Amino acid sequence: PDNFQKGMRLTVMPVYRPAASSILRSFRASGKRHLLLTGGRGSGKTTLLRALMPSLCPDAPMLLTAAVPGRWVEMRDTAAGAAAVIGRFDAALPPGENRMRPVPDGFAAVGLPALQRMAAASGWAVLDELGYLESGCADFQQSVLDMLKVCRVLAVVRKQDTPFLRALCADPDAFVYDLDCPVPPLGCIVMASGLGRRFGGNKLMADLNGRPLAA
């Protein structure tokens, strides 16, 4: 910028993104069955999913969605080679992200048969992505939730507040990784009774930011 003094340099700090291998280790250590990736637009959800697949589920069937901005959203079943429109742009809808109107027939033609085959196989299933359009097809939503009981799921989940997406991420067997918050809040736990003297006495009365650890 023009108002920068001569000799000053602008330093841009990169956004921290754990490697796919690190996320995979955390997921496996959790003991959960499903790995759900969420985050804002452009946060790298699909890129991360593709990086995880070779180690996690290289041959899993995939149900993909792709948007043509201002026109439609298409769902594609990679195993069957089938595709259908599941959302169409509607200029009458309020401005914002959700200007696609759900097309239930598209879910019925491609989405539901794909989920049924995935459930029957009882292996890994890959879904990219699940979002607000699914709210227009109750059968598809229920099929995804039912599939969690018989399959292992690797999925990209759009970061929106809908009953379906909340139920999906709240599943007790789901490990949810949020790319907008890659590092959990840090805390400090002091394991001390206060009675031992190996590291000095009155440990719980030690000062931290002007206050004792234990009041």
Model-derived regions: residue spans:
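N-terminal pre-Walker A segment at the start of P-loop NTPase domains
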Residues: 12-23
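Hydrophobic anchor at the beta1->P-loop junction of P-loop NTPases
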Residues: 37
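The conserved Walker
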Residues: 41
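Conserved lysine of the Walker
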Residues: 45
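Hydrophobic positions on the alpha1 helix immediately C-terminal to the Walker A/P-loop
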Residues: 48, 52
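N-terminal phosphate/diphosphate-binding loop that engages ATP/GTP or pyrophosphate donors
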Residues: 54-98
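N-terminal glycine-rich phosphate-binding loop and ensuing alpha1 helix
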Residues: 187-215
